[in-house]
Design a protein with these regions (language model features):
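Intrinsically disordered, low-complexity
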Residues: 2-75, 150, 154-175
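Short linear capping/connector segments at secondary-structure termini
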Residues: 44-48, 77-83, 113-115
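...with weaker cross-activation on analogous glycine-rich loops/strands in unrelated enzymes
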Residues: 63, 96-175
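Secondary-structure boundary/capping residues
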Residues: 75-76, 104
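Generic recognition of cysteine residues
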Residues: 76, 88-91, 125, 130
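Short, polar loop/linker segments at the starts of domains and inter-domain junctions
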Residues: 77-89, 156-159
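Active-site nucleophilic cysteine motif
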Residues: 83-102
């Protein structure tokens, strides 16, 4: 008799969870809760990043800003630090431009300062990789960088590079 009681209780608990899950799915149209689970990935099309449909506004804005300078500007040391709109950008100037577009920084930052920007570790949507000599960002699964991309100057790549030797940083607020 004790065994049957335990089985009945377990089935009742399982039924409650099933009803709760079905109700939650119906309330959201069958989609997952925003912010739950893995984030979408941007697509690369003709040298520009296309944001995923589930990307937060700050991420979309950062991608759009990066697209403004991707492969349309040359690389130059110090580029993008004197003013936001520049003829050329260096690595940290390009990353800063994208972060500024997403309203995550107010002023351009050199790579050494990006090592200390935001919070430690990888972000859900944007991770900045920085050391004293170089910086790049991974935004919605695509790498925005001034090296190891097609062409010259800032650009996107779906090929990742090693993060070894870089500090990993992310925006310190929920995007």
């Amino acid at each position: 008799m004790l065994f049957r009681t335990r089985i009945s209780l377990a089935l009742a608990v399982a039924a409650v969870f099933a009803v709760t899950a079905a109700s939650a799915s119906a309330e959201t149209g069958g989609t997952s809760t925003p912010g739950a689970g893995p984030t979408g990935e941007a697509k690369l099309q003709d040298g520009e990043a296309i944001p995923p449909s589930d990307a937060p506004t700050r991420v979309i804005n950062a991608i759009e800003a990066a697209n403004e300078i991707a492969k349309g500007h040359d690389y130059c040391m110090g580029g993008g630090h004197a003013r936001w709109k520049s003829q050329c950008y260096d690595c940290s100037g390009a990353v800063s431009f994208a972060l500024h577009g997403g309203r995550m920084i107010d002023d351009p930052m050199p790579s050494g300062s990006l090592e200390k920007w935001g919070e430690k570790g990888k972000g859900d949507w944007i991770t900045v990789y920085a050391n004293s000599g170089h910086a790049f960002a991974v935004i919605a699964g695509l790498r925005f960088d001034t090296s190891m991309t097609d062409g010259k100057g800032p650009g996107w790549s779906d090929e990742m590079r090693s993060g070894r030797g870089y500090k990993k940083r992310h925006f310190n607020d929920k995007i």
